[in-house]
Amino acid sequence: MRINVVPTGKVGEVEFGMSREEVRTLLGKATEFYKFEDDSNTTDDFGFCHVFYDQDNKCEAIEIFSEAEVFCNGTLIFPTDFITAQKAISDLEEDDEGLISYSQSIGIYAPDGEMESILFGKTGYYNE
């Protein structure tokens, strides 16, 4: 599966700010769950991705797993390696769990140096 992303805008056809119902119409049946103990809202699991919602049930972030290939500006950025991702997204910086871009709301989860997932969020997602 190929997914084209516009950072802070949309992931595939899903746009940040869409309602949970609109996302489910596009992506299909979801399993609802709490990803973390302190979450105030549920996350939708669509198999290849998790979709996170704010208090108003508006899409605020999407985490994609290795079942999909993610492209940004025509360049494969996931799954790939740190160097390739950093060339495509110039302000990615290393953190404890992988790579993060605060300005583009992108987080790459790679706790052991290998990419396991990539998260795209709405503007300011990592600053909240």
For the regions a language model picked out, list residue spans one by one.
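Non-cytosolic coordination micro-motifs
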Residues: M1-N41, F46, D56-E128
